Amino acid sequence: KVLFYDFINQHFDFPSTSTMSDGARECVIRSYGLSDEMINKEADKWLLQWIDAEYKLFKAFETKFYGDRLRTPFESMDELIAFSNTLLNRRKSRAGKSLEHHLARIFTCADLRFEAQVVTEDNKKPDFIFPGGREYHDKSFPKDKLVCLGAKTPCKDRWRQVLNEAGE
């Protein structure tokens, strides 16, 4: 908790999704004294821990930056809806990017070659391409050595996007 409070107190505005992910992950890594080897052995466990920690951190930032506003009546329904939409959109955006940031860290710990958000044909951007964009665009590179990964959460709401990025 001390690491969380220190991280929160360093920020005077809502941090970016990458800063939030990095901060939550660092808090967990430091709390448990994790090495890359330990993360590799139980990647699923630590991925879930990081996501949970980031969500808690995110809610603490919401309270810090929006708590006072919630205690004050809204002047109109439109004002309430606009405020609510701002919060909801931030939450939705954060959830998807959070997973991508944490997966990238796991791939890095495992010494995997990958690239995130590579622009492919028709301006599509799969979340990850293994081993990378250069190989993807190299027509002589064996297709069976390429992997595209769409990291979506929750998948039930995003299957159309996954199919689009896959070119289906």
Language model: regions and residue ranges:
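Surface segments flanking catalytic/ligand-binding clefts of nucleic-acid enzymes
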Residues: 74-78, 112-117
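Interdomain/boundary linker segments immediately adjacent to catalytic/signaling cores
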Residues: 6-97
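Catalytic core segments in nucleotide and nucleic-acid processing enzymes
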Residues: 101-104, 108, 114-168
